[in-house]
Structures are given as structure tokens and as C-alpha cells.
């Protein structure tokens, strides 16, 4: 299943990593470990952030996706399940609508 991972970095730890010349190496180490399908760096509520798409086979993998960000940057991590249009079709919305209408 596809997982959307939003990582939001607090200023102080990330700034320290930048000033020490370690931010790039830390980011690369994490990205090599979790192997996202795609990653975009942006901002979220005025803070540095990253949006990643990751394939995950079961929920027990969540710690391996989140802990590196917590431990390296003291970052906030949000995990959301994402569906393709085909996933949504297989979800049976029409039947659910009939059942719960």
C-alpha cells in the first residue's frame, strides 16, 4: 500500500546539522534506508519539510520509516495511507453507500 509521509523539521536541530555540514549526509542516509518512491522538499507551516511516497507492506514497518527522522532531526512525522483510483474502486463505495444510506 502507498503511504504518504510528511516530515516536518524543527528549526534548531536542522540548522545545527546545516551549520555542521551534516544535513545532506543525514538526509541521504535516511533516504537510502527507507527507499521512497518519490520525495519532495518544501515547507509546512513555515518550517522545512519533506513529502515522501513510500510502499509499505504492513503497519509494522512504520517505525522503520519514522524513527530515523525522530532520532536524527527531532522531526515530526505524519503517516497517511494513500489510495489510487483503482484502490478506491475496489473499496466498494457504491455498496457502502447503499448499506449506510
Locate the predicted segments by residue.
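Conserved, structured core segments of small domains
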Residues: 1-101
